[in-house]
Amino acid sequence: MNLQHHFLIAMPSLQDPQFKRSVIYICEHDEKGAMGLVINKPLEQLTVETILEKLKIKSPSRDPAIRLDNVVLAGGPLAEDRGFILHSPQEGFASSIHISPETMITTSKDVLETLGTSGQPKNLLVALGYASWRQGQLEQELLDNVWLTTEADTHILFNTPIAERWQAAANKLGINIFNIAPQAGHA
């Protein structure tokens, strides 16, 4: 089972404040473990523009018509000072990995220098921190009914309002997440 380019949808019974009602986009999943970004937990009072100001990144070709008030997301509890830009594919950045034909992740500063310019990726989200699982841990959490999974949907990823992403991801499975029983059997 490879869950790269899938959503993990927290079951209603998950009460850990880091992951309660979360949707995680899985960026990498292999025999060594998994890594993903929480895509529905905004960091209060932190926008892309604020990040650019703190890092003193000013582009001479900044287009004032391009909004930079997108909220920055709490990508997970690990390396919360490290930035991850999830975006539609665009070549030319120093440290990017293709996740799927519709998404790639970049961790190098050069992508930040394109934000607010005509050269920025078409779709993007910025997250600080990430979530990860060691070998076999995610698979065990799935067996323990901690998460639902579904293939990722770039509309949910980039266009659905943050507060609606948990329900929208569950809707892909044809379910109302609020109607799920906290305990499930394994028949």
Swiss-Prot record:
SUPFAM superfamilies per record: VC0467-like
Gene3D superfamilies in the record: VC0467-like, VC0467-like domains
Entry-linked Pfam families: DUF179
One GO CC term on file: cytosol
NCBIfam families registered for this protein in UniProt: PRK00228.1-1
Family: Belongs to the UPF0301 (AlgH) family.
Protein name (record): UPF0301 protein YpsIP31758_0835
Species of the source: Yersinia pseudotuberculosis serotype O:1b (strain IP 31758)
